[in-house]
Amino acid sequence: MESNKDEAERCISIALKAIQSNQPDRALRFLEKAQRLYPTPRVHALIESLNQKPQPAGDQPQPTEATHTTHRKAAGANTASANGEAGGESTKGYTAEQVAAVKRVKQCKDYYEILGVSRGASDEDLKKAYRKLALKFHPDKNHAPGATEAFKAIGTAYAVLSNPEKRKQYDQFGDDKGQAARHGHGHGDFHRGFEADISPEDLFNMFFGGGFPSSNVHVYSNGRMRYTYHQRQDRRENQGDGGLGVFVQLMPILILILVSALSQLMVSSPPYSLSLRPSVGHVHKRVTDHLNVVYYVADTFSQEYTGSSLKMVERNVEDDYIANLRNNCWKEKQQKEGLLYRARYFGDADMYNKAQKDGAPQAVTDCQRL
């Protein structure tokens, strides 16, 4: 089973670390568990290597070297069999199953197919599918070519489908946008036509409490993930043959900038803040009549807003306050749920107890305020 294979890989990883730390008994225990879960010649060779050359805890040079040699051979064989053309792309090993899984995601036509769920899937179904795939495709665990892009596609798929409004829009227009994006960018872009507001790496950290370092993923200030090779490719494609060509290509961007600037001038900033903001003059504290929400205004607020206009402002204040509570409550619940899942996945009782305590008081408080 796929779950047994993932657990076996985790046991192998722990065993290799134990060998490096001169803990042969611990290494042997986890290797035997891995062999029971998902028997492979590689694990059998590691077990034989430890059994043939037992050493005291403080003197383990020969088993360690033999085991590392066996591991390197197994990793090299997996890499060569997985993809001969991509062998030089990464110095880390990967399996044929990982390459096939990346290929499956790459060939998916919509977000539902990426997550492996039906169009009528519930929120719980989406969470289960995302947890399984995110751990499987995270760039620090899966080193197959294209795994990083597949991880991004999985995160974007969940972020869109878990948002009721975005999911409704995607069900109506997502396929058309996905086709336009694929025609414009090729298969390597993994459905860039319909973006989410949260980056896949941030989403992973919310679910699993930052279980992996983001060494291969670049997240910029707008919260969406981009990759350097896409930028270099776009720059090469957008280079014009002359000044007129450059001007024609830049014309849509200039128009967009002009429209954005005009819209900023036409839209005034809110006359209130939910927190103290001296930089914009919101220093005077007020409380709404209905929900007693605290907000801050400028010196001239009392003269400019009275009667119905004041009621409208306070209604907007309360709407913003409730939206913030819902967002914070959802994030804290997701983070706690992710920590609990990781604790159960790794069988760590201390982590489970910590997850039961961390974040719970604030999450309950925010939800109760609603």
Swiss-Prot record:
<keyword id="KW-0007">Acetylation</keyword>
<feature type="domain" description="J">
    <location>
        <begin position="110"/>
        <end position="174"/>
    </location>
</feature>
<feature type="transmembrane region" description="Helical">
    <location>
        <begin position="242"/>
        <end position="262"/>
    </location>
</feature>
<protein>
    <recommendedName>
        <fullName>DnaJ homolog subfamily B member 12</fullName>
    </recommendedName>
</protein>
<dbReference type="GO" id="GO:0030544">
    <property type="term" value="F:Hsp70 protein binding"/>
</dbReference>
<keyword id="KW-1133">Transmembrane helix</keyword>
<dbReference type="InterPro" id="IPR001623">
    <property type="entry name" value="DnaJ_domain"/>
</dbReference>
<dbReference type="GO" id="GO:0051085">
    <property type="term" value="P:chaperone cofactor-dependent protein refolding"/>
</dbReference>
<dbReference type="GO" id="GO:0005783">
    <property type="term" value="C:endoplasmic reticulum"/>
</dbReference>
<keyword id="KW-0812">Transmembrane</keyword>
<keyword id="KW-0472">Membrane</keyword>
<feature type="modified residue" description="Pros-methylhistidine">
    <location>
        <position position="185"/>
    </location>
</feature>
<feature type="modified residue" description="N-acetylmethionine">
    <location>
        <position position="1"/>
    </location>
</feature>
<comment type="subunit">
    <text>Homodimer and homotetramer. Interacts (via J domain) with HSPA8/Hsc70. Forms a multiprotein complex, at least composed of DNAJB12, DNAJB14, HSPA8/Hsc70 and SGTA; interaction with DNAJB14 and HSPA8/Hsc70 is direct.</text>
</comment>
<dbReference type="GO" id="GO:0065003">
    <property type="term" value="P:protein-containing complex assembly"/>
</dbReference>
<dbReference type="InterPro" id="IPR015399">
    <property type="entry name" value="DUF1977_DnaJ-like"/>
</dbReference>
<dbReference type="InterPro" id="IPR051100">
    <property type="entry name" value="DnaJ_subfamily_B/C"/>
</dbReference>
<feature type="region of interest" description="Disordered">
    <location>
        <begin position="51"/>
        <end position="92"/>
    </location>
</feature>
<dbReference type="GO" id="GO:0005789">
    <property type="term" value="C:endoplasmic reticulum membrane"/>
</dbReference>
<dbReference type="Pfam" id="PF09320">
    <property type="entry name" value="DUF1977"/>
</dbReference>
<comment type="similarity">
    <text>Belongs to the DnaJ family. DNAJB12/DNAJB14 subfamily.</text>
</comment>
<comment type="function">
    <text>Acts as a co-chaperone with HSPA8/Hsc70; required to promote protein folding and trafficking, prevent aggregation of client proteins, and promote unfolded proteins to endoplasmic reticulum-associated degradation (ERAD) pathway. Acts by determining HSPA8/Hsc70's ATPase and polypeptide-binding activities. Can also act independently of HSPA8/Hsc70: together with DNAJB14, acts as a chaperone that promotes maturation of potassium channels KCND2 and KCNH2 by stabilizing nascent channel subunits and assembling them into tetramers.</text>
</comment>
<dbReference type="InterPro" id="IPR036869">
    <property type="entry name" value="J_dom_sf"/>
</dbReference>
<dbReference type="GO" id="GO:0071218">
    <property type="term" value="P:cellular response to misfolded protein"/>
</dbReference>
<keyword id="KW-0256">Endoplasmic reticulum</keyword>
<keyword id="KW-0143">Chaperone</keyword>
<dbReference type="Pfam" id="PF00226">
    <property type="entry name" value="DnaJ"/>
</dbReference>
<keyword id="KW-0539">Nucleus</keyword>
<keyword id="KW-0488">Methylation</keyword>
<dbReference type="InterPro" id="IPR018253">
    <property type="entry name" value="DnaJ_domain_CS"/>
</dbReference>
<dbReference type="GO" id="GO:0036503">
    <property type="term" value="P:ERAD pathway"/>
</dbReference>
<dbReference type="GO" id="GO:0031965">
    <property type="term" value="C:nuclear membrane"/>
</dbReference>
